[in-house]
Curated annotation (Swiss-Prot):
<keyword id="KW-0547">Nucleotide-binding</keyword>
<keyword id="KW-0963">Cytoplasm</keyword>
<dbReference type="GO" id="GO:0046084">
    <property type="term" value="P:adenine biosynthetic process"/>
</dbReference>
<keyword id="KW-0436">Ligase</keyword>
<dbReference type="InterPro" id="IPR036676">
    <property type="entry name" value="PurM-like_C_sf"/>
</dbReference>
<dbReference type="InterPro" id="IPR016188">
    <property type="entry name" value="PurM-like_N"/>
</dbReference>
<dbReference type="GO" id="GO:0004637">
    <property type="term" value="F:phosphoribosylamine-glycine ligase activity"/>
</dbReference>
<dbReference type="InterPro" id="IPR036921">
    <property type="entry name" value="PurM-like_N_sf"/>
</dbReference>
<dbReference type="GO" id="GO:0004641">
    <property type="term" value="F:phosphoribosylformylglycinamidine cyclo-ligase activity"/>
</dbReference>
<dbReference type="InterPro" id="IPR004733">
    <property type="entry name" value="PurM_cligase"/>
</dbReference>
<dbReference type="GO" id="GO:0006189">
    <property type="term" value="P:'de novo' IMP biosynthetic process"/>
</dbReference>
<dbReference type="InterPro" id="IPR010918">
    <property type="entry name" value="PurM-like_C_dom"/>
</dbReference>
<dbReference type="Pfam" id="PF00586">
    <property type="entry name" value="AIRS"/>
</dbReference>
<dbReference type="Pfam" id="PF02769">
    <property type="entry name" value="AIRS_C"/>
</dbReference>
<dbReference type="GO" id="GO:0005829">
    <property type="term" value="C:cytosol"/>
</dbReference>
<keyword id="KW-0658">Purine biosynthesis</keyword>
<keyword id="KW-0067">ATP-binding</keyword>
Length: 345
C-alpha cells in the first residue's frame, strides 16, 4: 500500500449506503405496526413508549429469542419472508404466558454482507408478526460484519416488552387437581428442533420438495410459527386462566413443568389429537423415539392452557370462534414427590 492509497469503510466490507437503503425500505413496515403509546419514529438513539392507559399497577414483562437453525434451512431454500414472523412469535408467545399484552418489539439483524432485498424481506415478516400480535416495531439494529458470517448468511434476534396488571399476572400458582388442559394447535414445528430436522434431512437424503399431504416437506417445515396473542388475551379476559405453557425447545417434558406447582402433574391424552404429517415424517425418517419427539418438538401443540374444568366448554367455544384449532388435551392431577410432572398416555 502506498501513501496515496485511501481506504474506506466499504473497502473493509461495510456498505453504509446499503444500510441506509434498507432503512428507507422498512420505514413503512414500522409505521403499519404503530401503537398510540409510541412516541417519535425510527432513527432515534432510543425508542420511547408510554405505558397504556388503564393500568393501576402495570408490570413490564420482557423476552428475547431467536429462530435457531430454522434460519439455515430458510437461507438454503431462499425463503426469507416468513422467518421474521417466527422471530416475533417466539418472543410474544412467551410474554402472553404471564398474561402480558405485547407493547413493542426490536430486532437485531447481523450478516457478513448486507443484501438489502433479503434483509427487507426479513423485516417485512417481522412487521407482519407485529401486526398479528398488536405489537409496535419501534427499532432495531442491522450489523454488517465482514469476517463474522460466511457470505450473505445472517442471524436474527428479537426483543419484546409487554405489560400486565400486577394483580392479573399468570404464574401457575393457582393450578390444582382437576383443572382441565386445552391445547392450541401449532402450525408446524414452529422454531424449535431444527438441528435435529436438518440432521434427519442429511441422514435420510430426503428431497425437501417432496409432496407431504397437500403441501411439500419444505413448506411444512418452514410454515411460520403461529402467534397466539390476540385469542389468548381475549380468553384471559373471559375465563379464569391458571397457567399457560408455550411448547418450545424442550417440548412437552421441559415446558409444561415450568408452570406447574409442586405435587401436581399434567396428564396428557395422546389420543386426543393426531400428529400433523410433518412430525410423523420426521419420526419415521429419523427413527426418532416417541420420548425424543416429545422432548424436541411440539408434535402439533403450540400452547397448553390450564383452567378450571367448569370453564372448559366456554373456553373452547371462544377459542374456536377466534379461529383457533383448540381441544381438550388432558387434566391436572395430584403427584407425589419424585413423580414425573408430565404423563403422556
Amino acid at each position: 500500500m502506498t501513501d496515496k492509497t485511501s481506504l474506506s469503510y466499504k473497502d473493509a466490507g461495510v456498505d453504509i449506503d446499503a444500510g441506509n437503503a434498507l432503512v428507507e425500505r422498512i420505514k413503512g413496515v414500522s409505521k403499519r405496526t404503530r401503537r398510540p403509546e409510541v412516541l417519535g419514529g425510527l432513527g432515534g438513539f432510543g425508542a420511547l413508549c408510554q405505558i397504556p392507559a388503564g393500568y393501576k399497577e402495570p408490570v413490564l414483562v420482557s423476552g428475547t429469542d431467536g429462530v435457531g437453525t430454522k434460519l439455515r434451512l430458510a437461507i438454503d431454500l431462499k425463503k426469507h419472508d416468513t422467518v421474521g414472523i417466527d422471530l416475533v412469535a417466539m418472543c410474544v408467545n412467551d410474554l402472553i404466558v404471564q398474561g402480558a399484552e405485547p407493547l413493542f418489539f426490536l430486532d437485531y439483524y447481523a450478516t457478513g454482507k448486507l443484501d438489502v432485498d433479503t434483509a427487507a424481506a426479513v423485516v417485512t415478516g417481522i412487521g407482519v408478526g407485529c401486526e398479528q400480535s398488536g405489537c409496535a416495531l419501534v427499532g432495531g439494529e442491522t450489523a454488517e460484519m465482514p469476517g463474522m458470517y460466511e457470505g450473505e448468511d445472517y442471524d436474527i434476534a428479537g426483543f419484546c416488552v409487554g405489560v400486565v396488571e400486577k394483580s392479573e399476572i399468570i404464574d401457575g400458582s393457582k393450578v390444582g387437581d382437576g383443572d382441565a388442559l386445552i391445547a392450541l394447535a401449532a402450525s408446524g414445528p414452529h422454531s424449535n428442533g431444527f438441528s435435529l430436522v436438518r440432521k434427519i434431512l442429511e441422514v435420510s437424503k430426503a428431497d425437501v420438495h417432496q409432496p407431504l399431504g397437500d403441501t411439500t416437506l419444505a413448506s411444512a417445515l418452514l410454515e411460520p410459527t403461529r402467534i397466539y396473542v390476540k385469542p389468548v388475551l381475549k380468553l384471559i379476559k373471559e375465563c379464569e386462566i391458571h397457567a399457560l405453557s408455550h411448547i418450545t425447545g424442550g417440548g412437552f417434558w421441559e415446558n409444561i413443568p415450568r408452570v406447574l406447582p409442586a405435587n401436581t402433574q399434567a396428564v396428557i391424552d395422546e389420543q386426543s389429537w393426531q400428529w400433523p404429517a410433518v412430525f410423523s415424517w420426521l419420526q419415521q425418517a429419523g427413527n426418532v423415539t416417541r420420548h425424543e419427539m416429545y422432548r424436541t418438538f411440539n408434535c402439533g401443540v403450540g400452547m397448553i392452557i390450564a383452567l378450571p374444568a367448569d370453564q372448559l366448554e366456554k373456553a373452547l367455544t371462544l377459542l374456536k370462534a377466534e379461529g383457533e384449532n383448540a381441544w381438550h388435551i388432558g387434566h391436572i392431577a395430584k403427584a407425589v414427590d419424585g413423580e414425573e410432572q408430565v404423563i403422556i398416555q
